[in-house]
Structure formats: structure tokens, C-alpha cells
Amino acid sequence: MEKIKKSYLLVAKLKFKYFCLKPYSLNSTTKFILKIIKNKSMLIFN
């Protein structure tokens, strides 16, 4: 369980960097994947 949380935190950090650095260069597929990851991480942390 701890490993899963750490990997989600890492993904969240990467996602945050992507949205800060390149908000307009992400293609729709990447955005879709990040959306799914976001939804799953919300389920885990809430």
C-alpha cells in the first residue's frame, strides 16, 4: 500500500510539472491519461 501511495505521489508531482511548464503542449491522449490518473489518485487519497 505504501509503494502505491508513493508512486501516485510521484505521478502527481510529474503531472503538476507538466501542467505548470507546458499547459498547452499536451495532446488529448496525454490529457485523458492524466485525467484518469487524477481520478484514481483522488479515490486513494480521499
Curated annotation (Swiss-Prot):
Keywords, sorted A to Z: Chloroplast, Plastid
Compartments where found: Plastid, Chloroplast
Main location: plastid
GO CC aspect terms: chloroplast
Superkingdom as given in the UniProt entry: Eukaryota
Protein name: Uncharacterized 5.5 kDa protein in ccsA-rps6 intergenic region
